């Protein structure tokens, strides 16, 4: 299970969003399961912390950064952009 998925002409992006400022491995379980079914998808974990991290192919992004990048993330999923 993931919170939401974007699909467009450049592929799939899957997102898990948590309010917490701390990350534990079990929080990434849904993204890892989704990635098994869709290995080419880009995975994002958005959380309430302050550090940008990476866990394997999962990009871990602070909420503030994700909000600033939202126009880019959304335009990526629009067909023809």
Regions found by a protein language model. Give the residues of each.
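A cross-kingdom feature that marks ATP-driven nucleic-acid transaction machinery
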Residues: 1-81
């Amino acid at each position: 299970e993931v919170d939401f998925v974007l699909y467009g002409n450049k592929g799939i992006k899957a997102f898990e969003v948590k309010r917490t400022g701390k990350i534990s491995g079990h929080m990434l379980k849904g993204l890892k399961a989704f990635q098994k079914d869709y290995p080419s998808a880009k995975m994002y974990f958005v959380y309430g912390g302050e550090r940008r991290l990476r866990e394997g192919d999962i990009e871990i992004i602070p909420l503030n950064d994700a909000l600033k990048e939202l126009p880019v993330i959304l335009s990526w999923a629009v067909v023809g952009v």
